[in-house]
Amino acid sequence: MAGRGKTLGSGGAKKATSRSSKAGLQFPVGRIARFLKAGKYAERVGAGAPVYLAAVLEYLAAEVLELAGNAARDNKKTRIVPRHIQLAVRNDEELSKLLGDVTIANGGVMPNIHNLLLPKKAGASKPQED
C-alpha cells in the first residue's frame, strides 16, 4: 500500500515543541489556553488568543522588571524588592495609569514633600529697605 502511513525505516516520531517555543515566548501558552477555557470567558477560544495574551503578559512583565531593576540599581541594590517595583510603576506614567488602583504589598509610598514645607531659598528673599 504505497503512499499510506509511515514508510519503513523512517526517522520516527518528531520531537514535540511547545506553542510557547513556536511563538518565541517564555510565558506558557498552553497554561493560558487552559485558563481561558476553564474560566468560561467565552464558549470557544481561538488558537491565536492564548498566544497573543501570553505575549502581552510577557511584555508587561519584562517592562516592569526592567524598570524595577533600574530602580534597584539606583539604590545600589542587586535584588529587586517590592519597593523597587512600586517606585518603577509609580514613576512611569503609563504603568501608573494602568495599575492606578493596585496596591503593592510592602511597596511603601512615593516620596513627596509639600512645597510649603520646604526651606526657603536664601537668594529668593529680597532685602528690606528702611
From Swiss-Prot:
Tissue expression profile of the protein: Low level of expression, mainly in dividing tissues: floral buds, margins of newly emerging leaves, expanding leaves and the meristematic zone of root tips. Also expressed in many non-dividing cells of the elongation zone of the root.
Post-translational modification: Not ubiquitinated.
Single Gene Ontology BP annotation: response to bacterium
Top-level taxon: Eukaryota
Pfam family, one: Histone
Expression induction or repression: By phytohormones. Transiently by wounding.
Entry keyword Nucleotidyltransferase: no
Region of interest: Disordered: 1-23
Gene Ontology terms, MF aspect: DNA binding; protein heterodimerization activity; structural constituent of chromatin
Location of the protein in the cell: Nucleus; Chromosome
Keywords, sorted A to Z: Chromosome, DNA-binding, Nucleosome core, Nucleus
One annotated Gene Ontology cellular component of this protein: nucleolus
Assembly and interaction partners: The nucleosome is a histone octamer containing two molecules each of H2A, H2B, H3 and H4 assembled in one H3-H4 heterotetramer and two H2A-H2B heterodimers. The octamer wraps approximately 147 bp of DNA. Interacts with VIP1.
Family that this chain belongs to: Belongs to the histone H2A family.
Function summary: Core component of nucleosome. Nucleosomes wrap and compact DNA into chromatin, limiting DNA accessibility to the cellular machineries which require DNA as a template. Histones thereby play a central role in transcription regulation, DNA repair, DNA replication and chromosomal stability. DNA accessibility is regulated via a complex set of post-translational modifications of histones, also called histone code, and nucleosome remodeling. Required for the T-DNA integration step of plant transformation by Agrobacterium. May play an important role in illegitimate recombination.
Other remarks on this protein: RAT5 is required for Agrobacterium-mediated transformation of root but not of germ-lime tissues.
Protein name: Histone H2A.6
